[in-house]
Amino acid sequence: MEQEEPAVFGLGWLDQTQSIASNSANGLAMRMDRFFGVQRIDIEAAYSSLRLTTIQSWNDIDDFDTGVRLRGKVHLPRINERISLIFSEEDGDGTNYYTQNAASVSEQNTTRMNLEFDLTEQSRHRLFFRVGMRSNLKGRISARYRYEQDSDSRTNNRFTQSLYFKDGKGFGSFSRYQLDHVLANEGLVRWTNDVRFEETYTGAEYTSSLEYLQLRSNETAVSWYGRVNGVTSPGYVSSYDLGVRMRRNIYREWLYLELEPGYTWRKDAYALAREGTPYIFLRLEMAIGSYNR
């Protein structure tokens, strides 16, 4: 007799009911992204979810910093099955990798509330439209297209393109290409490239990162990463980063603890000298999901 799925559950329950091994890059990537709390995976899921994260960070340049994030998606089936309420820091698919994982909490974006309309849903193609309000009561709208391979191969390609308008700042675009490849021992190699243009920029922001992610068990995962962040005008690399994220599901299916030490070589402006500093993040996250019945 099959166990009935709970109406409300800790997101760790989803992984504990699945086997660790996967020969599919898409399947393993989904598990990794859900475990590490990557916003894309929750926003595109069939369930509602909320993640509340407290963040403590330190680096030798900015000293200690503290932050709180609320992210997630709440389906609104009584209004329309294709409409959801989104809590997000992101425009379209996301800010660049550097902003989401900067060595200072204060450099990360604050949470915004948006209504999202799922315009089309196919196995490979999805199109979303989002309208929301920023904390200063400025409006913002965006459209996001996502293409992803629909296959069981060990390699998976994903491309997303977002176009958006911010009241007071003008138009912008965000592009992301991501390549996942499954290795032995439940390991995943991920190469991610981001480019952002905005009317207020003289050029573009870009990020390229390489990660090796590994599930150690249903409760533990590790990610080693290196990334380069820069701007095109004036052309310079704003940071080189090396680090590791160690994340564990603790005590309850809805509670995660994460430690992220690393080292960054920063250049905060074109005319400034590059500085190197170690950094460390400590995150405690509550992650709860709900099926719509």
Question: Locations of the language-model features?
Answer:
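Transmembrane beta-barrel domains of bacterial outer-membrane proteins
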Residues: 1-293
